[in-house]
Amino acid sequence: MKVGLSMERYRGYRIEQTENGFRITLDDGSGKHTHIKSKSFCKRLIDFVVDNKVPPRVSNYILESCIRLSSNENYIQKISKLIETRKLKDKQYYFNPHKKRF
């Protein structure tokens, strides 16, 4: 970490500024961490993990970040099931019948 980059403690986690964004680390020394671009979203993500809530309408990367930061097995299983459900669903593609294909 370079000199002058900030570090903040929030609800049992450390938010450290890196060159490309922020790193959230569990304060207990276990080494669990994840990387996020925005400091405000870091705090929201920590709130979700501490309160055991599943973040709405987020990418699989964010859900996996919640798994990395949490130590609650029920919470981890709930998010893992959501990720698996998303992977099993097929993406519905739009087909324009009037467009000519060559």
Regions found by a protein language model. Give the residues of each.
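Intrinsically disordered, low-complexity, compositionally biased regions/tails
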Residues: 16, 25, 33-35, 55-57
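Short arginine-rich
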Residues: 48-59
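Intrinsically disordered, low-complexity mixed-charge
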Residues: 101-102
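Active-site-proximal or metal-binding-adjacent scaffold patches in catalytic folds
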Residues: 66
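Short N-terminal "domain-start" leader segments
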Residues: 1-23, 71-80, 84-98
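A short, exposed loop/beta-hairpin motif centered on an aromatic-Gly-Thr core
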Residues: 26-45, 49
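Short amphipathic alpha-helical segments that mediate assembly, nucleic-acid/protein binding
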Residues: 39-43, 59-63, 72-81
